[in-house]
């Protein structure tokens, strides 16, 4: 085995040492999740400074591309090498990327920094879950995973709020500088307090021999395949028509590389980046389906609910973040409640179904938003959706750790987190295309004199008001709201489809031996 099962119990800790390590992991996860959304508010100031409007899309996609592309590689690294040192290296890369972004003298340097930060971030959340697996007994892990899931949700929704505060009060560069002291605290705690015994294989063969088990061919094929599909979805229908040769070539290349990667995984067997016996294990496969769709639904809502507040209710990004607190609180409460109850009962499988059902009902309610909806309704709808997501957000990782031997937990955990991120990345791009297309169509159908649909689409969630004559504003808001509801319907469909994975989860208990 790659990880010595006999050493698992010896690495469990408790008391103040455990709390400090968990707190440091929460801080690291907070920074990683914050980076997904914090920049959205700062982009106008960045473009004012660098004068590169065409680079706006890359500020987010550079981070997202590398975050997704390196997920599975980190799973293999955590399986082969010291969890402590792999995590610290990932954190260091993330910090270097954040520093480059903070001091960036040009738009190109900022994009490079975002890409480097993404490489580091792809190993941090997985590393936090793997660390919990090492230091906490299986029966007690759900509540700690719930805390990590809750923190990720808090940071994702709070990003625009903090980004607005930094941009308005100091400088947009603090959107990145904030990661440095927080990451530094995490690094110090992990460096001095975390002690995980070396795996039997690492003690026997050494680091150089273990490097041969990294499946370099699989990584070389897999990484560009993910970049190709994400670029195709990022550009398709926005920068280039779907029929454009560039988009078609990217999709074809993605398909060829993905098929090649699967063949390599089959041939490599246990040495593969994702061994087939891990990916095909019933709970792992079903959890992957579940988290793909819950990730898709959640990220679509995280990005577009604040846009609804800004566009329809004419709120600032900061106020939109404040009004999204119902979603934050519900998500956090759901994650902690499900983790605590699972700790008590041992059963995690019911939460998959509960999450899918409540999340779907909440998403359905969000598709009922109107321009003049009452505050009590949108607060209740956001809370219902948020608690549904919270119930299931971390359950995939719990299921994987319950059914896989410790040697395969890092790979299974990385797979789950990769699929969850991929679902969010893919459907956020799909939602963007649907929103832009439907908004332009809705505005064109109004046939209002002097109204330029393309200009309004490009003006953003608040800037469009300056392009609309007051007497036409009510009609434009209805058209804008309808386009956003089409996006919410994408999240609703994904929420409903998550049940396909939920019903297949094996009914096991974290209180039983694997």
Curated annotation (Swiss-Prot):
Glycosylation sites: 343
GO molecular function: transmembrane transporter activity
Coarse class of the protein's main subcellular location: membrane
Phenotype of gene-disrupted mutants: Does not affect aflatoxin secretion.
Ranges in coiled-coil conformation: none
GO cellular component: plasma membrane
Induction remark: Expression is not regulated by the aflatoxin pathway aflR activator or aflS coactivator but by the fadA-dependent signaling pathway.
InterPro entries linked: MFS, MFS_dom, MFS_trans_sf
Transmembrane segments: 13-33, 61-81, 85-105, 116-136, 146-166, 174-194, 218-238, 247-267, 289-309, 321-341, 351-371, 378-398, 411-431, 485-505
Lipid bilayer topology: Multi-pass membrane protein
Localization in the cell: Cell membrane
PROSITE patterns: MFS
Keywords: Cell membrane, Glycoprotein, Membrane, Transmembrane, Transmembrane helix, Transport
Pfam families for the chain: MFS_1
Record function comment: Efflux pump; part of the gene cluster that mediates the biosynthesis of aflatoxins.
Annotated family: Belongs to the major facilitator superfamily. TCR/Tet family.
Protein name: Efflux pump aflT
Organismal lineage: Eukaryota, Fungi, Dikarya, Ascomycota, Pezizomycotina
């Amino acid at each position: 085995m790659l990880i010595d099962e006999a050493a698992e119990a010896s690495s469990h800790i408790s008391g103040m040492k455990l709390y400090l390590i968990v707190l440091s992991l929460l801080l690291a996860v907070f920074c990683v999740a914050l980076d997904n959304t914090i920049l959205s508010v700062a982009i106008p100031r960045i473009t004012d400074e660098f004068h590169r409007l065409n680079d706006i899309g890359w500020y987010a996609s550079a981070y997202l591309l590398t975050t997704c592309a390196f997920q599975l590689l980190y799973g293999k690294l955590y399986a082969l090498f010291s969890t402590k040192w792999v995590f610290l290296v990932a954190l260091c890369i993330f910090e270097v990327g954040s520093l480059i972004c903070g001091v960036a003298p040009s738009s190109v340097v900022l994009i490079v920094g975002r890409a480097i930060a993404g490489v580091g971030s792809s190993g941090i959340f997985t590393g936090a879950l793997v660390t919990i697996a090492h230091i906490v007994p299986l029966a007690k892990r759900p509540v700690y995973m719930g805390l990590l899931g809750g923190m990720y949700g808090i940071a994702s929704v709070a990003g625009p709020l903090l980004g607005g505060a930094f941009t308005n009060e100091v400088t947009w560069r603090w959107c990145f500088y904030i990661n440095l002291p927080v990451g530094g605290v995490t690094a110090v705690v992990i460096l001095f307090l975390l002690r995980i015994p070396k795996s039997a294989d690492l003690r026997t063969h050494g680091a150089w021999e273990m490097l041969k088990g990294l499946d370099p061919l699989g990584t070389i094929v897999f990484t560009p395949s993910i970049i190709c599909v994400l670029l195709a979805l990022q550009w398709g229908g926005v920068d280039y028509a779907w029929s454009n040769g560039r988009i078609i070539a990217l999709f074809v290349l993605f398909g060829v590389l993905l098929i090649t990667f699967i063949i390599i995984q089959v041939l490599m067997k246990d040495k593969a980046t994702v061994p087939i016996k891990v990916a095909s294990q019933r709970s792992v496969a079903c959890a992957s389906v579940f988290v793909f769709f819950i990730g898709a639904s959640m990220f679509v809502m995280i990005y577009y609910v604040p846009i609804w507040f800004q566009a329809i209710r004419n709120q600032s990004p900061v106020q939109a973040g404040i009004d999204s607190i119902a979603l934050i609180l519900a998500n956090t409460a759901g994650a902690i409640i499900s983790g605590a109850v699972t700790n008590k009962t041992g059963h995690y499988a019911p939460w998959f179904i509960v999450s899918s059902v409540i999340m779907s009902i909440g998403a359905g309610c969000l598709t009922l938003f109107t321009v003049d909806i009452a505050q009590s309704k949108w607060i209740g709808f956001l809370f219902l959706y948020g608690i549904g997501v919270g119930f299931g957000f971390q359950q995939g990782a719990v299921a994987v750790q319950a059914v896989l031997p410790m040697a395969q937990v890092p790979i299974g955990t990385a797979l789950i987190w990769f699929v969850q991120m991929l679902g969010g990345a893919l459907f956020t791009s799909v939602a963007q295309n649907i929103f832009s297309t439907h908004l332009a169509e809705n505005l064109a159908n109004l046939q209002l004199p002097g109204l330029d649909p393309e200009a309004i689409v490009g003006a953003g969630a608040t800037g469009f008001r300056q392009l609309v004559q007051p007497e036409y504003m009510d009609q434009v808001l209805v058209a804008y709201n309808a386009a956003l509801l089409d996006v919410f319907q994408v999240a609703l469909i994904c929420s409903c489809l998550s049940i396909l994975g939920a019903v297949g989860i094996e009914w096991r208990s974290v209180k039983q031996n694997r």
